[in-house]
């Protein structure tokens, strides 16, 4: 999770740095560390230890504390992912989870990308918007036309997020460099998407995603389709994968910083009065900024809606209690969280899925990860980094201002899946899904608007 500069009343910062001013410092520190030998391992320790479960899944715990922990049973796939062997060495002074989270939000660069926006009308009359990148600062990257059968990547941002978020833009650039089409799915009310029904979106509402996937599949009938979700977008994506199970039209997916168990995430979120309290208020502010534009839709509405509480929500729980849980028919906030967790869905996933988590994530705590269900599902691969915060991951060649450490791993995983799919026929089991209507299309400069909250749930 990260907070944009606007959400705390600071001047917006657009960090498109041509050079990395800290790289020399980092190199000096690395040289200093290299002068000292590694500590001897304890008696009986080995370079790599595999603990096999009855499901033949491996839990790889390495002596090097900077290497990620990996859980998965597809050894052939893991052998092809060279980036899995990279240690996670956070940028100097980024060892604290809050520092890494907030630094990434404020100081990660925002690539300039122009997009074509499609406004889609859903089956219930609701509206979502898709942003298709057209061009950017690197003209040569965007000038050439991609083959019609190039793979397509659907991106699902976090809570109140959209195509303006820096982590989304960096993934758009990386996908293009690899010759992939990509599109950002902006949920109802997010990134200036209009709200046309008295309903926003929730952690378990997958009908919009079903229709977006159908729309993309119809448009790119010769391409394999994949999806990447961050935080709340990851929870929605995994819920979708579990619901469609063996009838999933996606060829693969990636989940990053997924809260998984929303009850546990909510419990940890409200422990103490530290940074989590700051995050909660910032998130609530982002939701409040969306709501006033659409209050007329809730005038005179029946039910247990508490509009005054929603309009003044000081926490995400306030907003969910007054609006979200009522819109989607839950009895209470606790009922909503316990029945919307993607940890309930992971066992049903039959699509290749990579889950990347940070062990020190302040918003998606590691104790909420469904470790056993992931180990027992041969379609899932879990990577847990020792640090990273919430969608921070300020490490790797592009640190501190560039793309997060996870991006090369995400793209390599998708490329391996696509290579395996080339020989296989496309599966499109979406005939029973409503095809959304395109209401309008227009060009949009994505840098004109910044979400009040970035990198969050």
Curated annotation (Swiss-Prot):
Residues 448-457 have a biased composition (Polar residues). Its EC number is 3.1.1.-. Residues 438-447 have a biased composition (Basic and acidic residues). Residues 39-59, 438-457 are annotated as: Disordered. Disulfide bonds: none annotated. GO terms for molecular function: monoacylglycerol lipase activity; short-chain carboxylesterase activity. Pfam families: Abhydrolase_1. Coiled coil: none annotated. The active site is at 231 (charge relay system), 361 (charge relay system), 390 (charge relay system). Belongs to the AB hydrolase superfamily. AB hydrolase 4 family. Keywords: Hydrolase, Serine esterase. Residues 151-391 form the AB hydrolase-1 domain. The gene is EMB8. It comes from Picea glauca (White spruce). This is Embryogenesis-associated protein EMB8.
């Amino acid at each position: 999770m990260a907070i944009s500069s606007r959400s705390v009343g600071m001047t917006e910062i657009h960090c498109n740095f041509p050079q990395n001013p800290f790289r020399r410092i980092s190199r000096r520190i690395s040289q200093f560390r290299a002068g000292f030998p590694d500590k001897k391992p304890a008696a009986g320790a080995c370079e790599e230890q595999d603990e096999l479960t009855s499901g033949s899944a491996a839990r790889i715990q390495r002596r090097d504390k900077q290497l990620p922990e990996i859980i998965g049973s597809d050894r052939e796939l893991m052998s092809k992912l060279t980036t899995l062997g990279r240690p996670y060495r956070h940028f100097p002074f980024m060892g604290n989870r809050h520092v890494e989270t907030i630094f990434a939000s404020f100081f990660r660069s925002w690539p300039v990308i122009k997009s074509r926006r499609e406004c889609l009308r859903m089956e219930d009359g609701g509206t979502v918007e898709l942003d298709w990148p057209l061009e950017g600062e690197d003209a040569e990257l965007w000038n050439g036309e991609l083959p019609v059968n190039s793979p397509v990547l659907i991106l699902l941002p976090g809570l109140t997020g959209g195509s303006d978020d820096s982590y989304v833009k960096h993934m758009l650039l990386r996908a293009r460099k690899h010759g992939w089409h990509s599109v950002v799915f902006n949920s109802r009310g997010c990134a200036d998407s209009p709200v046309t029904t008295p309903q926003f979106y929730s952690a378990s509402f997958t009908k919009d995603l079903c229709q977006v996937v159908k729309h993309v599949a119809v448009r790119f009938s010769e391409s394999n389709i994949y999806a990447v979700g961050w935080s709340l977008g990851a929870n929605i994506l995994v819920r979708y994968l579990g619901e469609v199970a063996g009838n999933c039209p996606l060829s693969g997916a990636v989940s990053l910083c997924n809260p998984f168990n929303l009850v546990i995430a909510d419990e940890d979120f409200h422990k103490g009065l530290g940074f989590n309290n700051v995050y909660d208020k910032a998130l609530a502010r982002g939701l409040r900024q969306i709501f006033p534009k659409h209050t007329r839709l809730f005038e005179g509405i029946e039910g247990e809606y508490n509009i005054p509480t929603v309009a003044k929500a000081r926490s995400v729980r306030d907003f969910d209690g007054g609006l979200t849980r009522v819109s989607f028919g839950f009895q209470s906030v606790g009922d909503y969280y316990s029945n919307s967790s993607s940890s309930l869905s992971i066992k049903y996933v039959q699509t290749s899925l990579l889950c990347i988590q940070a062990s020190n994530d302040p918003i998606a705590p590691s104790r909420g990860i469904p470790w056993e269900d992931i180990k027992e599902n041969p379609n899932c691969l879990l990577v847990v980094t020792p640090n990273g915060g919430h969608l921070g991951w300020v490490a790797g060649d592009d640190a501190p201002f560039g793309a997060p450490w996870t991006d090369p791993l995400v793209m390599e995983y998708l490329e391996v899946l696509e290579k395996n799919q080339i020989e296989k026929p496309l599966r499109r089991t979406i005939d029973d899904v409503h095809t959304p209507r395109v209401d309008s299309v227009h060009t949009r400069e994505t840098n004109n608007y910044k979400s009040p909250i970035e990198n969050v749930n």
